[in-house]
Amino acid sequence: MCKMAIIPDWLRSHPHTRKFTHSRPHSSPCRVYSRNGSPNKFRSSSTTAVANPTLSSLDVKRILFQKITDRGDELQKAFQLLDTGQNLTVSKSELRRIITDFLMPLTREQFQDVLAQIPLSTSGTVPYLAFLSRFGGIDLYINGIKRGGGNEMNCCRTLRELEIQVGEKVFKNIKTVMKAFELIDVNKTGLVRPQELRRVLETFCMKLRDEEYEKFSKHYNIHKDTAVDYNVFLKNLSINNDLNLRYCMGNQEVSLENQQAKNSKKERLLGSASSEDIWRNYSLDEIERNFCLQLSKSYEKVEKALSAGDPCKGGYVSFNYLKIVLDTFVYQIPRRIFIQLMKRFGLKATTKINWKQFLTSFHEPQGLQVSSKGPLTKRNSINSRNESHKENIITKLFRHTEDHSASLKKALLIINTKPDGPITREEFRYILNCMAVKLSDSEFKELMQMLDPGDTGVVNTSMFIDLIEENCRMRKTSPCTDAKTPFLLAWDSVEEIVHDTITRNLQAFYNMLRSYDLGDTGRIGRNNFKKIMHVFCPFLTNAHFIKLCSKIQDIGSGRILYKKLLACIGIDGPPTVSPVLVPKDQLLSEHLQKDEQQQPDLSERTKLTEDKTTLTKKMTTEEVIEKFKKCIQQQDPAFKKRFLDFSKEPNGKINVHDFKKVLEDTGMPMDDDQYALLTTKIGFEKEGMSYLDFAAGFEDPPMRGPETTPPQPPTPSKSYVNSHFITAEECLKLFPRRLKESFRDPYSAFFKTDADRDGIINMHDLHRLLLHLLLNLKDDEFERFLGLLGLRLSVTLNFREFQNLCEKRPWRTDEAPQRLIRPKQKVADSELACEQAHQYLVTKAKNRWSDLSKNFLETDNEGNGILRRRDIKNALYGFDIPLTPREFEKLWARYDTEGKGHITYQEFLQKLGINYSPAVHRPCAEDYFNFMGHFTKPQQLQEEMKELQQSTEKAVAARDKLMDRHQDISKAFTKTDQSKTNYISICKMQEVLEECGCSLTEGELTHLLNSWGVSRHDNAINYLDFLRAVENSKSTGAQPKEKEESMPINFATLNPQEAVRKIQEVVESSQLALSTAFSALDKEDTGFVKATEFGQVLKDFCYKLTDNQYHYFLRKLRIHLTPYINWKYFLQNFSCFLEETADEWAEKMPKGPPPTSPKATADRDILARLHKAVTSHYHAITQEFENFDTMKTNTISREEFRAICNRRVQILTDEQFDRLWNEMPVNAKGRLKYPDFLSRFSSETAATPMATGDSAVAQRGSSVPDVSEGTRSALSLPTQELRPGSKSQSHPCTPASTTVIPGTPPLQNCDPIESRLRKRIQGCWRQLLKECKEKDVARQGDINASDFLALVEKFNLDISKEECQQLIIKYDLKSNGKFAYCDFIQSCVLLLKAKESSLMHRMKIQNAHKMKEAGAETPSFYSALLRIQPKIVHCWRPMRRTFKSYDEAGTGLLSVADFRTVLRQYSINLSEEEFFHILEYYDKTLSSKISYNDFLRAFLQ
């Protein structure tokens, strides 16, 4: 029972009845069946409905709702037909077939939108109850519709009875039955299976017993295994049905008479469920009247029932629940009629119902009074039905015209001056649609049958006015109509009327909108829009206007988006045909008055209204001149704007052709003869006419009589010309108001004025703007105007400065423009930043000099500590106080007042306001060999060596003690670690070691841990790692002590040749140590290390090895261009290296970097983005961390960190974020320590494990970048972001590990590849550029490398993968792994050739005396210069500016890395070998500096 209660009633079996039940009575059953028995009636239509792709989702939803409401029973039966399993679901294809056959065809996208709104089952099928409820508003679980009666027949029907009943059911609804057959017949074969035939009959006709169907199928030769032709079956059923009907005609007539007699006994509407066809015999007004009467009687019951259905007391119930309550206590009305009735009360079936407001309208006494006509009475005759239809139309018309009756009568009298004069049907219908209510074609036709029974085509206005007055009198005397307030028209009808009205008056409506929107922004004010709507739609109430505005209102500004309204009507652009322009204040009455003035006779007006396709009337010369006068005198903005669109400015002239276009666009079309006469009259010259000349001519008094005296060419007098100009004070007063009238905001005006789109406007542009605003100034007055604004002719303005000009505020003559104010503001900001940095340095110098002095490592020849720019900068960056280059220069100038470039400790502390103390303020001795370039005395070297030896001796002694007491220490550690975590704190470790007889200070213990590589976590140490390190130190502790006793070789005193030999000796004597060091770097045992790591290891073993010596060493070994060095080959074969066999030795060394995994590359890319985000938005990210850290623990959770990464870096997948989280500093509770994170990622180079080695030193030799990794990751910063003030610079004496900066890929000589590609790209470069732009969504000028490879294959460019890789490396200009397609296409299409010269002349290189020192001139050097000459000559000016931007000090010299970066930035075709030869020529002294002026001068002779 419970299961049956859940299933709707209409899913249960049909009962059967032997009586004939008709939805409406027919006069003769024979006529019905003879019509239905026609063969064409059940033949499938040959036409196929086509889906309309222009329908929006809202349109589809509205149409589906309407059709489901009308055909709900058919749809339910169709779903039941396909739902063979009775599980209340159908497949997606079955749902689409039902929608296509029974409702409307849909496109694939439209069907997907419908499907997306239905919850699918777990098996992917569609619950069709949800579909009907969602799109039809049918709550089938509450208000189910039964399939038939409830009882089956006990006796078996005869064959004749079956044929008659089945035939009646089939042919009464033949279209639905045919659609059901076609629904099953998916392949359109015309055949169905016998079981499917039975399902159709039982679903759409009646239930059949097995013996009845067996008898029926045997009669029609339907076998179980044979397909049935349903067209033939229906044809045979039709023939047999006609024969049977003739036999039982008498009984049928008797049953019909009994049914009609039974219906005639009813005095009111049936309280039980009745057929919709019976309700159709009553008008909606009568149903409404009796519905209100019955509701007033059951008001309390209805109120209690609705209150019970609103348990939350929100005041809203569903539409279906409202219908159930009203069906129970008032009338059980069919759903379609109920929806129409509720629309009269302003209710919709798709929204929640405010039941309290609904009942309030009936609770008032006047709302409960009804007419004295009593209950509904059924009208049987045709005349009475037609009469009621006419009354319905008149009632509907008067109900909606009661408020507008006066304006309706006025409009009728205006259009027809005679009170009893006729009016055409078209004019009458247009007035009704505009002033009253929109009538359908059938309703208007029935109204015309009463007003124009003779079908003359005209309507007597006096007759219609009498009907209006009579209706008003009747409504005053009638208690029902007087008491009842008219219902507002439903919004759907109002919206349709508004759209129709706008469509009819499209051009006038659009012109009036544009008159309020001169800038064509698509927005106007709400009040202006209301004025326009009252002109064209006076019937629009305030509530309807608010509803309309809510759909097309801009939320931000509150203005009306009228183009959105036009788009809803189906108009995407301005109308093409332009009738006469309608001014702002021209109402509909004025339009009718114009018709009244002309007033042609009735036949002419009829002809004009019928002929809708005629073109706009051509105007004569006199009419156009009169129109010109009005436009100039009233300053019509539409005409002026259209004129200026062609002339660009008031002084600009337009030709005769453009002037005619202006006339046509502003609604003044003329034929050629009249136009020629017009140009003659207004004095149009061959060179054209400006707007000022045109306006001056028509403002002149002689132009007042164009009919009598043709106007002379406009030659304004001098007084008029002077009066046309205004003074500077008047312009200053009018400028803000005119600007506000012409543009919606200052940005629009600035964008219009900035013709070259560079973000800057000059005073000439400002003058053009004033002319556009019709503010005409003479030159001297314009200069005075600029003076009032604090400007001058040479000044330029950006947008913020221009915006200040547009603000309404008093201007002063001594007020400067913002361009002069802005640098002062920046100066104030920079001074504030400098002062903050200065105060921080003061605090650190007073309290923590040891921390501050770690960055102060340089001394002069006298042993005094000195400071340079980099020392202060490194200190500030170490304390997370970054300054811009300009701010730092101001801070340094505050200390270095004499401009020496360095200051002493005494001078620095004096500037800080601190007294100098030699004992306290001394250089830091820690890490003394890692300082950046200093000059020391020999005595200082000896002191440093002594300190180093003492620390080494202490470390050896401590190590010996630890090894002697290893077992005791191990037992003590195990005993101390009671939690068994293997970790103990440093303090606890010191106590244990002291108890075991190995007393160590915290500094000594820290030094040991660092030397052994034992890591610390939250000030705790894994003692197992510590003990293991002690054991491993046994082998290294017994090293021979000769090296300790002997002084290390000082490479700084050797020349490069001697340095190479000494390096060979060091490598031979320290192979084991070198192998250990290289193995620590080569964790994957590939045999390769990066060039930067290789150089660092050698410099660690070769004391004081300079960069020049190291570079010379790499060149001798021919490995200076190798990004990866095979250290195993180097150690095994360097002892037998000879300079004579250097080439052969280098060729045998294995080449190629080890392959990297895609995940590692992606991780480096993410870390680079994270580093870039932190450095560029440091304070913002810090603030976000602090906002999350509400407990002030300096930690945040994993989810909070991920949210910041998603917002500041990029949205990461779970796998990517897991790998990133593993690299973050996390405490024991799994929370991120964001101070450590910020200090790690805010430095110039991201010190991350995955990024180690990806950056290279900006030097020659070891600075050769990583080809395989650098080009595939975005770790290296783009060249455009490497500003001179923020990039790291290395000193020649700086170890590689301390000066690692983001590197760039190597130079590439792709000239042969590009030369071969030119022929192929010449024919397809436009299409290639288009494809690249489509892939470049962000419009950055570059695309992914994979996209470029795909385009190479698509356009068949015939280049190998290696060549593609070379091109990708070359055009990765931003070092972000992307391909700069614009530069690539330009280099292939723009063929630059060298300057042609005579055979006796060749390019010269500077002589040696012009340069300080020049290197060797090789053939490779000359060939490289000759090849790149055209490119350098083409772009040498911007290249020189770029060189200067990298040369901060203005020395004319650049480092090798910066020089390489600039060459890559301009796509210079150079290989690394050629680059090496250029360096040899321009840097013979190996100073790692290139004179870029000497380099450029070679190409400019």
Curated annotation (Swiss-Prot):
Ca(2+) binds at D754, D756, D758, D765. It comes from the Eukaryota. SMART domains: EFh. Keywords: Calcium, Cell projection, Cilium, Cytoplasm, Cytoskeleton, Flagellum, Metal-binding, Nucleus, Phosphoprotein, Repeat, Repressor, Transcription, Transcription regulation. One of its GO terms (molecular function) is calcium ion binding. Pfam families: EF-hand_11, EF-hand_7, EF-hand_8. InterPro entries: EF-hand-dom_pair (IPR011992), EF_Hand_1_Ca_BS (IPR018247), EF_hand_DJBP (IPR015070), EF_hand_dom (IPR002048), EFCB6 (IPR052603). Residues 35-47, 1270-1279, 1286-1301 have a biased composition (Polar residues). Residues 1303-1501 are annotated as: Interaction with PARK7. One of its GO terms (biological process) is flagellated sperm motility. Residues 70-105, 172-207, 297-332, 403-438, 439-474, 504-539, 634-669, 741-776, 847-882, 883-918, 964-999, 1069-1104, 1176-1211, 1212-1247, 1359-1394, 1434-1469, 1470-1501 form the EF-hand domain. Its main location: nucleus. Residues 1407-1501 are annotated as: Interaction with AR. Specifically expressed in the testis. The modification Phosphoserine is found at S1290. Microtubule inner protein component of sperm flagellar doublet microtubules. Binds PARK7. Part of a ternary complex containing PARK7, EFCAB6/DJBP and AR. Negatively regulates the androgen receptor by recruiting histone deacetylase complex, and protein DJ-1 antagonizes this inhibition by abrogation of this complex. Microtubule inner protein (MIP) part of the dynein-decorated doublet microtubules (DMTs) in cilia axoneme, which is required for motile cilia beating. This is EF-hand calcium-binding domain-containing protein 6. It comes from Homo sapiens.
